[in-house]
């Protein structure tokens, strides 16, 4: 399991400054000095808790070093900084990288880890895969995708076609050292209508079976539709089903797990996440840790179709949750810096349109006119469904 198997045995050395002895620190086994850097060895599956603890103690994390690895600088995870009444600070515009690597000239990434995200009792298998891209020119932004070219050939002896996957890490990578890119990949499987045979997706199966050290051909990045708004005071509404969570994990890490000098999020992020079972909530611990640490800036709403019911007794899909909150969402959409991002199954779209049509009508508006003439025209409605 992600954060529970291979990663659990990995240790990281934290360098922390600014700690002070308090009643709380005296209850721990840590020897707290009143000045200088202090170092802590922390297992991977306790990193979130440890960073929250350091924040409570008033400290600042200045680097993380994988034991037997290299130093990866990391700022402290603290409450989003107040703006002290100043005008909103806009993130410096960056060039959007596109097709740095093409299918005829891919770069080579090396697998660092490949870990299961679905917990016991869940459906299917989904892996969080981290690739080492150091030594390449690959760079990317939150909301983009990369292409993967599976090894081997198809039935006709030709190379397999590439498949695109949404990136699940920020531009700085999971270790925040600008040397990795991460994916969230579900192994595709379906029944052949004629034979009943189970068919597995070529690329998703290839990725799910990779081992640390394996080399993979990577292309891209591609995509401009899902780029995260650079307004640190924006309202960001995210609608995800299944592995559609990938770009939103990147968004949330950028908002809450990194302390970028040019982007300190002070707005509202609201994630609606639809899954079949609780065991299928991908990155559950991460999401709930962020919610606990930033309750004023992050809202988390699950739609668990096999476990939750709508008021009329039906299964609770994500569109049902949108219907419950449609009036509030409508009001949020009147703000010029509210963006909606949708990623996952296309089947959620009609129900969301229906819910928002009803909410708009209560306010004397036509949802389709508002959607096309305002949200899409202003670049505030972002959709990547399949």
Swiss-Prot record:
PROSITE patterns: CPCD_LIKE (PS51441), FAD_FR (PS51384)
Signal sequence region: none
Residues passing through the membrane, by range: none
EC category: oxidoreductase
Binding site for FAD: 163-166, 184-186, 190, 202-204, 243
Cofactor entry: FAD
PANTHER family in the record: PTHR43314
Assigned protein family: Belongs to the ferredoxin--NADP reductase type 1 family.
NCBIfam families: FNRPetHCyano
Name of this protein: Ferredoxin--NADP reductase
Source species of the chain: Thermosynechococcus vestitus (strain NIES-2133 / IAM M-273 / BP-1)
Phylogenetic placement of the source organism: Bacteria, Bacillati, Cyanobacteriota, Cyanophyceae, Acaryochloridales
